[in-house]
């Protein structure tokens, strides 16, 4: 049996949008879907029947969600899973055997910030994580992927290229960074210091996309090098008109202890469009 797309569902509008996005993807890729709903048992007291009540409420919620999902894509096999406690922990655990985890942005407005639980899922999942908001997708086109020379970014490009080729979309590979302030470079012997840095990063960008033309001969790839904008800001701007944004779980500047890098975190908290954290396989770091 194919690995399922696991969807965290609750009663928020963004969760409904996430379920719709996941169902469409599942139908296209011929994958099953598992709807996971977590009930809050922090105030559970058997003496007042709370446990039974929240469980029954959760069962009813999942049954209704399954019915709505079936109407969205009748050909997709949908199962449900009711869990107690934190949604972040439950989805993270199920990500080990999932094709993808899909969650809503956590709030009822487009571009709204993520809840702590949603960020937790994005940080600990062992598979790609799609975060979906209530964005108007009219007139949006193209897939954008952020790169920085890290192994995570290379995996993100591989994922984004496959998505763009499958969907018939153009791919924009964006490498953004800020060159050092003038006061930082005082005393540096190279008079063309900024040019040297820029050229080195241009090579990083070129190496990141190397091989895509051979693997996807019909894929249109745009390489963008931005030396005047912080990575997160550049990705947010590019994602504002994109159909999909793909980022790595963390970049080359992240500490080993961080499960979610600062750029990915910043992008998710201001979600510009459907965004995927492309965690494909574990990457070992020496730092």
Model-identified regions with their sequence ranges:
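Glycine-rich, Arg-bearing micro-motifs that act as flexible, cationic patches
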Residues: 102-122, 140, 244-266, 270
């Amino acid at each position: 049996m194919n690995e399922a797309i696991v969807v965290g569902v609750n009663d928020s509008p963004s969760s409904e949008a996430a379920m719709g996005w996941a169902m469409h993807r599942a139908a296209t890729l011929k994958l099953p879907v598992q709807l996971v709903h977590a009930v809050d048992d922090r105030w559970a007291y058997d003496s007042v029947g709370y446990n039974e009540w929240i469980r029954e409420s959760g069962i009813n919620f999942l049954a209704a969600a399954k019915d709505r999902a079936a109407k969205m894509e009748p050909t997709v096999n949908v199962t449900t899973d009711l869990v107690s406690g934190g949604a972040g922990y439950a989805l993270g655990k199920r990500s080990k055997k999932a094709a993808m985890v899909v969650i809503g942005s956590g709030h009822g407005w487009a571009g709204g910030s993520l809840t702590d639980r949603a960020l937790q899922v994005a940080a600990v999942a062992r598979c790609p994580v799609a975060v979906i908001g209530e964005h108007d997708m009219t007139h949006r086109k193209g897939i954008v992927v952020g790169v920085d020379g890290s192994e995570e970014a290379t995996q993100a490009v591989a994922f984004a290229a496959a998505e763009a080729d499958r969907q018939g979309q153009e791919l924009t590979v964006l490498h953004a960074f800020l060159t050092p302030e003038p006061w930082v470079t005082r005393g540096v012997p190279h008079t063309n210091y900024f040019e040297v840095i820029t050229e080195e990063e241009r090579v990083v960008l070129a190496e990141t996309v190397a091989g895509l033309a051979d693997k996807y001969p019909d894929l249109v790839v745009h390489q963008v090098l931005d030396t005047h904008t912080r990575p997160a800001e550049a990705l947010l701007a590019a994602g504002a008109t994109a159909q999909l944004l793909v980022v790595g779980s963390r970049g080359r500047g992240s500490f080993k202890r961080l499960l979610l890098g600062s750029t990915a975190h910043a992008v998710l908290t201001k979600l510009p469009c459907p965004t995927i954290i492309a965690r494909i396989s574990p990457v070992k770091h020496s730092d």
